[in-house]
């Protein structure tokens, strides 16, 4: 009986018909791809892209030179040099470098920072022509923070209930 059923299936091309029907359904379904350079999909608030150093609303940089991000970085991509203590007892960085070639975008630096100074922003389009352009210094990181501050603040606020 099973052999008769199998012969009927192959004679009537049941598998072919079901596969063809599936192909036709997928052919006329809406496309799932985006035309990337011209269309961009949504980015999660937790997306880890290009690094940035943030400032307070009064313009002062947030980094207090605690060096927690440097200590926790598994790739040892962060180098910080702290300046002398100021009159109010706080410190600021003299040098803050990130080697983006070494960085593995794990987000540990962002999680370790007690003042949300170093963040990974929403920018994922930072391809360069030379390797040297991927060595970010403090000025480059602060410029990134200034450029993306609105989006970074929105993403941190959206993620705040889960921290």
Swiss-Prot record:
It is found in: Cell inner membrane. NDH-1 shuttles electrons from NADH, via FMN and iron-sulfur (Fe-S) centers, to quinones in the respiratory chain. The immediate electron acceptor for the enzyme in this species is believed to be ubiquinone. Couples the redox reaction to proton translocation (for every two electrons transferred, four hydrogen ions are translocated across the cytoplasmic membrane), and thus conserves the redox energy in a proton gradient. GO terms for molecular function: 4 iron, 4 sulfur cluster binding; iron ion binding; NADH:ubiquinone reductase (non-electrogenic) activity; quinone binding. NCBIfam families: NuoI, PRK05888.1-4, PRK05888.1-5. Keywords: 4Fe-4S, Cell inner membrane, Cell membrane, Iron, Iron-sulfur, Membrane, Metal-binding, NAD, Quinone, Repeat, Translocase, Ubiquinone. Pfam families: Fer4_7 (PF12838). Binds 2 [4Fe-4S] clusters per subunit. This is NADH-quinone oxidoreductase subunit I. Its EC number is 7.1.1.-. GO terms for cellular component: plasma membrane. GO terms for biological process: aerobic respiration. PROSITE patterns: 4FE4S_FER_1 (PS00198), 4FE4S_FER_2 (PS51379). [4Fe-4S] cluster 2 binds at residues 73, 103, 106, 109. It is a peripheral membrane protein. Transmembrane segments: none annotated. Its cofactor is [4Fe-4S] cluster. It comes from the Bacteria. InterPro entries: 4Fe4S_Fe-S-bd, 4Fe4S_Fe_S_CS, NADH_quinone_OxRdtase_chainI. It catalyses: a quinone + NADH + 5 H(+)(in) = a quinol + NAD(+) + 4 H(+)(out).
